[in-house]
Curated annotation (Swiss-Prot):
This is Leucine--tRNA ligase. HAMAP family: Leu_tRNA_synth_B. It catalyses: tRNA(Leu) + L-leucine + ATP = L-leucyl-tRNA(Leu) + AMP + diphosphate. It comes from Shewanella pealeana (strain ATCC 700345 / ANG-SQ1). It is found in: Cytoplasm. GO terms for biological process: leucyl-tRNA aminoacylation. The keyword Aminoacyl-tRNA synthetase applies. It holds the Pfam family tRNA-synt_1g. The gene is leuS.
């Protein structure tokens, strides 16, 4: 065995072996327990970042561990390869998105192989290929036939100068990223999938996800947002018009003093006909940012319509206002306003001088609304026949009254909206719908699928090539002229079912049900918590759609979910002559002074700029603080990078990148290598005879088997990989100090190293692959099983007993593990420190905690 640890040489050799033997290619085997481990597939942006490396290292550790459990393990990989970044890069580099994407895939594929991830590359998919999106298009037509797809107008970001739709990220401070024109909101027809039809099931089935993080489940419950309330009808005074309002607080209905409607509400448009101020306000609302964060932060404004609504219970008239905080596409586009019991309504009423009438008070006191709204539930007053009722009693009574009079009904609502899947972009899967010359809209016939996206295009940076090319849209259906849909799918469509396609990636059908039902559901899914409410919800929804189409037989796509934390690194900047921040890469920074806790006080870059240190923040291009995985692998080897990633922090917490810690991981592997080298150089190893071991050898073997048990539990049940590694490191420290003179010393070291190498194999597989054979074991390490715990080794021959007199420590004694209470008591009483503190006293009681403590009570 070579003395020096040379990762580049070792890793290249081992990776070539895996490739030549197709080690990680798997097929269905009914005689083996399956395990499907999946990490969220990457977008091929050009290079892997450390966030990818962390995600995929966790997945690989889990996969390799399960393989050593004797399971049939599937760990596939692919590329989430449609999306806007490819269009932007194509425009910038004067190319088309396709070649840019495929070049990135090739480069990143080599990076993944360089890191030693055990993927079944025979199942590789790229979502931008017709072989993949063909079946997505087919499935969409089936959903349309089932009535789960529809088209309606919806608001988009519109650049009037370029006459094109903009994605949210292309709107910078309300202006077009390209020409700086003020962006407008425009209503255009778009396709939707009825996820709301599954809202109740998606919500209820969260309770079955026992091995998903509570945080993700809570976020999904809130996103789905089930509420129970009453939908009530308000008449418009002086007309036969009416409109509906939904509220979850019907107990406050007697305190309604005005009604607020959305700028897009029919009543708002009607009232604006002779009201220039309202016209201007409606335009302002239409062009406002309607994201939740923006809505929460913006100033609440309104304009009176001049119309009044008739209260459905009291018959009083209340004014109707247009408010910028009401959205047409949420609820009914109208809200009842009770300023005494809603803080937003309170502030709005104060601002515009509207009435505030309290109708709820605490059970045991008076209500004070002089400074703010009283928003708690309490008892009703100033509410006519409902006075004195609590929330639930008032809810029921008001519901009964409105229902009897035909003015309202109890209703369950969801915050969740139907999934808009239309994107006015080029680089996506074409939506397989056509419009005939007579205006009939229909799905593309199956024999015309896939609708192929042309890849040889010129990007002008303004309009999608399939929108500007009028010929592409033309087609013929049953001899009739027809026009293809020129919108493409939201890229969440591709990522919602890729996990299932891996089960039969080359099938001439969407899924091979037999293969899908062998592998699914995914046993372990790994990805960032930022995907909790979008991808992970669509992922669950799509699985139910696949189930209801007869393609899978399970209810949920993944049994267990691990959400890994972000990777952080130091961030530094200086202000240039224009006052703008220039972020400097950590590799270009020299730290000149630190405080007593090691924190940076003074730092400069290579050009002498004095830098501001902002602390640790997420690795990103914007802060120029990313660390290139390639550089780290070239410098230390893939196994070192993997070990650091798994050891530096628990997987769900943020990981702070410290190169000094990477160096520490590298030293540990070199120490392991040296320990194995020295053991092999020490000569032939005899058979281990556990019956002839001395006390020190038994203790070392006990530590070995305790470590095996702990590491297995840490990896499988607790998923605390960092503590598993810490246990192995502690054991290695003991092994390095262990004697190696006798045959049984050497035999015990052989057993220990064989076990340690298998424990570490999922984490540092290249090193362990080589060491396994160097230690004289036959065959590849992938073909062996996880070390078994020898329960007999855990049995201790002796126990250390703490001896106290009146609760104070007076001695420590070692007794046989099976010693009786009487024997322990006799040994304890004979100790000098015990004799000294009991000789002039009467022993009143002796308390013995078996194997731990002897307490003598004397006075």
């Amino acid at each position: 065995m070579q003395e020096q640890y040379t990762p580049s040489e070792i890793e290249a050799k081992v990776q070539q072996h895996w490739q030549d033997t197709k080690t990680f290619e798997v097929t269905e085997d009914e005689n083996k327990e399956k395990f499907y481990c999946l990490s969220m597939f990457p977008y091929p942006s050009g290079r892997l970042h450390m966030g990818h490396v962390r995600n995929y290292t966790i997945g690989d550790v889990v996969s390799r561990y399960q393989r050593l459990q004797g399971k049939n393990v599937l760990q596939p990989i692919g590329w989430d390869s449609f999306g806007l970044p490819a269009e932007n890069a194509a425009i910038k580099n004067n190319t088309a998105p396709a070649p840019w994407t495929y070049e990135n895939i090739d480069y990143m594929k080599n990076q993944l192989k360089m890191l030693g991830f055990g993927y079944d590359w025979s199942r590789e998919i790229a979502t931008c290929t017709p072989e993949y999106y063909r079946w997505e298009q087919w499935f969409f037509t089936k959903l349309y036939e089932k009535g789960l797809v529809y088209k309606k107008t919806s608001s988009v970001n519109w650049c009037p100068n370029d006459e094109t739709v903009l994605a949210n990220e292309q709107v910078i401070d309300g202006c077009c990223w390209r020409c700086d024109t003020t962006v407008e909101q425009k209503e255009i027809p778009q396709w939707f999938i009825k996820i709301t039809e599954y809202a109740e099931e998606l919500l209820n089935d969260i309770d079955t996800l026992e091995e998903w993080p509570e945080q993700v489940k809570t976020m999904q419950r809130n996103w789905i947002g089930r509420s129970e309330g009453i939908e009530m009808t308000f008449q418009v005074a002086g007309s036969d018009q009416s409109f509906d309002i939904y509220t979850t607080r019907p107990d406050t209905v007697m305190g309604v003093t005005y009604v607020a409607i959305a700028a897009g509400h029919p009543l708002a448009e009607q009232a604006a006909i002779n009201n220039p101020a309202l016209v201007e306000f409606i335009e302002e609302c239409k062009n406002a940012d309607t994201t939740e964060a923006a809505m929460a932060a913006m100033e609440k404004k309104g304009v009176a319509t001049g119309l009044n609504a008739i209260h459905p219970i009291t018959g009083k008239e209340v004014p109707i206002w247009v408010g910028n905080f009401v959205l047409m596409n949420y609820g009914t586009g109208a809200v009842m306003s009770v300023p005494a019991h809603d803080q937003r309504d309170y502030e709005f009423a104060k601002k515009y001088g509207l009435n505030i009438e309290a109708v709820i008070k605490p059970v045991d006191g008076e209500v004070d609304i002089s400074e703010e709204a009283y928003t708690e539930k309490g008892v009703l007053f100033n509410s006519a026949e409902f006075d004195g009722l609590d929330f639930q009693a008032a809810f029921d009574a008001i519901d009964a009254k409105l229902t009897a009079e035909g003015k309202g009904k109890r209703q369950v609502n969801f915050r969740l909206r139907d999934w808009g899947v239309s994107r006015q972009r080029y680089w996506g899967a074409p939506i397989p719908m056509v419009t005939l010359a007579d205006g009939t809209v229909m799905p593309t016939p199956e024999d015309q699928l896939p609708v192929i996206l042309p890849e040889d295009v010129v990007m002008d940076g303004i309009q999608s090539p399939i929108k500007s090319d009028k010929e592409w849209a033309k087609t013929t259906i049953n001899g009739q002229e027809a026009f293809r849909e020129t919108d493409t799918f939201d890229t969440f469509m591709e990522s919602s079912w890729y996990y299932a396609r891996y089960c039969s990636p080359h099938a001439d059908e969407m899924l091979d049900p037999a293969k899908a039902n062998y592998w699914l559901p995914v046993d372990q899914y790994i990805g960032g918590i930022e995907h909790a409410c979008m991808h992970l919800l669509y992922f669950r929804f799509f699985h139910k759609l696949l189930r209801d189409t007869g393609l899978v037989n399970s209810n949920e796509p993944a049994k267990r979910l691990l959400t890994q934390g972000m990777v952080l690194a130091d961030a530094y900047y200086y202000n240039n002559e224009k006052g703008a921040r220039v972020w400097v890469a950590p590799s270009d920074v020299t730290v000149q002074e630190t405080d007593d806790k090691g924190r940076t006080v003074k730092a400069v870059d290579s050009e002498g700029h004095e830098l501001v240190y902002t602390g640790m923040s997420k690795m990103s291009k914007s802060k120029n603080n990313g660390i290139d995985p390639q550089e780290m692998v070239d410098k230390y080897g893939a196994d070192t990078v993997r070990l650091f990633m798994m050891f530096a922090a628990p997987p769900e917490l943020t990981l702070e990148w410290q190169e000094s810690s990477v160096e520490g991981a590298h030293r540990f592997i070199k120490r392991l290598w040296k320990t194995a080298h020295d053991h092999i150089a020490n000569g032939t190893t005899a058979e281990l005879d556990v019956k002839s071991l001395n006390a020190a050898q038994k203790e070392l073997r006990r530590e070995l088997h305790k470590t095996i048990a702990k590491v297995g539990d840490d990896i499988e049940r607790r998923q605390m990989f960092n503590t598993a590694i810490a246990s192995i490191m502690e054991l290695m420290n003991r092994l390095q100090k262990a004697p190696s003179e006798t045959d049984q010393d050497k035999a015990l070291m052989q057993e220990a190293l064989n076990a340690v190498i298998r424990l570490l194999y999922p984490i540092i597989p290249h090193t362990c692959f080589v060491l396994w054979n160097e230690l004289g074991n036959q065959g590849a390490i992938e073909e062996v099983l996880w070390p078994e715990v020898d329960e007999s080794a855990l049995v201790e021959d002796s126990k250390l007993i703490i001896v106290q007199v009146n609760g104070k420590l007076r001695a420590k004694i070692t007794v046989a593990a099976d010693a009786s209470k009487e024997e322990v008591e006799a040994a304890g009483m004979a100790e000098e420190g015990v004799v000294k503190h009991t000789e002039d006293k009467t022993v009143r009681k002796v308390i013995y905690v078996p194997g731990k403590l002897l307490n003598i009570v004397a006075n």
